[in-house]
Amino acid sequence: MTNNLKKTVYLIRHGQAQHNVGPDEDHNIRDPVLTSEGIEQCEALAKELESKQIPIDGIVCSPMRRTLQTMEIALKKYLAEGGPDKVPVYISPFFQEVGHLPCDIGLELDKLNKLYPKYNFQSCQDGIYPEKRDIYASDVTISAIRSKEALEYLAALPQQQIAVITHSAFIRFLLKKMVKAADIDFLPPQLSFKNCEFRIYDLVQTTTGELKLVESSSA
């Protein structure tokens, strides 16, 4: 294995959202938002990142509301308007959640642009998003292909210390830990990141050219 990329990736799962608590019917909420507890989790993560002096120089975020909210709260230090620590934000549909339930389907772009006018959603203007088809289909094989493209996306960015705000099931695809028998709509808790959990990985390229996330020795 070799690593000429010299990139560090901080994988962050979003804070607790409406579909993470309550009855199964909550999975029918379209693109749910954070709960009050989820907001508190994000505030705690903001303090943790600051106390550990995490040197983020780029942010990649899923275009779903719970991840956008998590980014705005947990990474507020890095998003400071005009501040010395302000870093670029990349909104990418590659990092949306897998699954076909309403809770895993994003809002239409016109609504997103109204809710979050300061961000660029151009990458979502692909004629597919937010529909769950083609590269975004709720399918294990397709999601594995999407995770490969997501890693290629990260590798192509000019930044070296990248925070990625994404979702529990898709994180398992990024880490190549999803098995075909797994239910991607209802992932067992023992197989997932906790809400607002973050872990540090090195983005490396193997001798065969494969991109992988390997847990960092500095974690």
UniProtKB/Swiss-Prot annotation:
Task: Please list the residues that make up the active site.
Answer: 14, 167
Q: Does the keyword Hydrolase apply?
A: yes
Enzyme class, first EC level, given as a word? hydrolase
EC number(s)? 3.1.3.-
Task: Give a GO molecular function annotation for the protein.
Answer: phosphatase activity
* Highest taxon listed in the record's lineage: Eukaryota
Q: Which UniProt keywords apply?
A: Hydrolase
GO cellular component terms given for this protein: cytoplasm; cytosol; nucleus
The protein's matches in InterPro entries, at most eight in alphabetical order, are given as:
His_Pase_superF_clade-1, His_PPase_superfam, PG/BPGM_mutase_AS, PGM_Phosphatase
Family, per entry: Belongs to the phosphoglycerate mutase family. BPG-dependent PGAM subfamily.
Question: PANTHER family annotated for this entry?
Answer: BROAD-SPECIFICITY PHOSPHATASE YOR283W-RELATED (PTHR48100), PHOSPHATASE SPAC5H10.03-RELATED (PTHR48100:SF54)
| Protein name (Swiss-Prot/TrEMBL) | Probable phosphatase SPAC5H10.03
